[in-house]
Amino acid sequence: MKKCRGRPKCPRRVEQTPDITYFKPRGVPLSDLEVVSLTVEELEALRLVDIEGLRQEDAASRVGISRRAFWEDLKSARMKVAIALSKGKAIEIKGGNYIRAESSDINEDADT
């Protein structure tokens, strides 16, 4: 099934980028694992709601997108993390389309 193309995603404001970008099951070489890719803005959605305890509406405002777009990012992030944890896959955090909150530089990665 072909994915529908709609409006391009607008950049999200991200306050924290991760220092550590890989997580994997212990005792299994990375070369033997399937990898799930989580974008920086998906990680930010998880951080704002699940760690900082913000409501989705407040988190969406902080990131600079609609509540619906934020919900899609959060849903995607939770699904990817759940799949990786339940199926023993590695998680790589990379890419996306975001702006660092304290700068106006856009980091756009076409791979996502």
From Swiss-Prot:
InterPro entries reported for this sequence: UPF0251, WH-like_DNA-bd_sf
PANTHER family reported for this sequence: PTHR37478, UPF0251 PROTEIN TK0562
Family: Belongs to the UPF0251 family.
Name of the protein in question: UPF0251 protein MA_4245
